[in-house]
Design a protein with these regions (language model features):
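Membrane-proximal basic amphipathic "stem/tether" segments
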Residues: 1-69
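C-terminal active-site "lid" helix and adjoining low-complexity regulatory extension at the edge
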Residues: 264-303
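Short, flexible loop/turn elements at secondary-structure junctions
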Residues: 103, 124, 175-177, 192-194, ...
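Coil-to-beta-strand transition motifs
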Residues: 94, 183, 192-198, 255-257, ...
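Short catalytic/ligand-binding loop motif for oxyanion handling, primarily in non-cytosolic enzymes
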Residues: 84, 107-110, 126-131, 139-140, ...
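A long amphipathic alpha-helix within ATP-dependent nucleotide-binding catalytic cores
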Residues: 166-170, 214-269
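Phosphate-binding site of ATP-dependent enzymes
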Residues: 114, 138-228
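A conserved helix-loop-beta module that forms one wall/lid of the active-site cleft
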Residues: 51-135, 142, 149-162, 170
Length: 303
């Protein structure tokens, strides 16, 4: 009951999210062809259909990649457990957030063996985590319901992002990472093109009031937005920024485009995840000219 009330409140606060879910539910039911689906999905986000015969913008090129550059190895790179192993093999263990375990079933988790604090999420899904700061107060029933709900999801179908289609749903529990001073963690998301960082976004206030700012490789603020407003205060260049660039580029070698998400916690860099289609290729740039500018960096493969 409380969960239902929470969903209703969330829908009231964000009616556009409700409309999007309704539209995509109808689209998934009616349109099975991937190309037709991608075109209508793009239309919903940007108000027009993409030019897939001669894509020019960043969003159009992401849509083209979804349909034409399907590499099976990408599946492991988006699996939240396998991606850590992929990164570990390239950059080493020092940059990987410790994992306490991975399970196929919630019932198999031995919570008595876990530390007092941890983070629980699923390996195939996105957009949520469960943070436990005191195991004695951890609501297992609520967590189990959230996991069961997540296990029903397959991110492939929402935007036709093919790497997610065959990711096995599992539960992963990791160490809770905390910034000294109590500030929330910042997400640093590096947009890599053929193994080179061209820009990054910094996400702040993720749990309360999400703000997103874009920067070029030299950490100069870029004058555009995508979906979220800019931060209220200037964002300082993080410590070990050059190391973050180095790690992102090591992980993106040989890939036309991938977003490498990193954390910089108390001066230590940690790998987060990898994303091949930022925003699903359906999120507007404001102003629109930046969709074309960023699109120039993405060189589509000939395969």
């Amino acid at each position: 009951m409380n969960r239902t009330i929470s969903k209703i409140k969330k829908g009231i606060k964000n009616p556009s999210m409700v409309r999007s879910k309704i539209f995509h539910s109808i689209l998934m039911a009616l349109v099975k062809d991937d190309e037709k689906y991608v075109k209508w999905d793009y239309w919903w986000g940007l108000g027009k259909f993409p030019n897939l015969d001669n894509p020019q913008t960043y969003n159009e090129k992401l849509c083209w990649l979804k349909l034409n550059a399907r590499r099976p190895e990408y599946t492991k790179m988006v699996d939240k457990y396998d991606a850590k192993e992929f990164a570990r093999n390239i950059v080493g263990d020092n940059y990987i957030i410790p994992t306490y375990g991975v399970w196929d079933r919630f019932e198999d988790i031995d919570f008595d063996a876990l530390p007092n604090e941890f983070v629980l999420k699923t390996t195939h899904d996105s957009g949520w985590v469960i943070i436990c700061k005191d195991k004695s107060k951890f609501d297992k029933n609520s967590a189990k319901k959230k996991v069961e709900e997540s296990f029903k999801n397959n991110l492939y179908y929402y935007h036709r992002e093919y790497p997610y289609k065959d990711v096995k749903p599992r539960i992963i529990i990791e160490k809770l990472m905390v910034e000294n001073g109590g500030g929330g963690l910042k997400d640093y998301k590096f947009f890599c093109f053929d193994g080179k960082v061209k820009m990054l976004l910094v996400a702040t206030g993720r749990t309360v009031d999400t703000r997103i700012d874009f920067f070029d490789r030299d950490f100069n603020h870029l004058p555009f937005k995508r979906k979220y407003p800019h931060a209220l205060k200037p964002i300082a260049k993080p410590e070990n920024y050059d190391k973050m660039i180095e790690i992102a580029e090591m992980l993106s070698i040989g890939i036309p485009h991938v977003r490498v998400d990193l954390y910089n916690i108390n001066g230590q860099v940690y790998f987060g995840e990898m994303t091949f289609f930022s925003g699903g290729g359906t999120v507007k740039f404001e102003p629109d000219e930046w969709d074309y500018k960023v699109g120039e960096w993405l060189k589509l493969p000939k395969e």
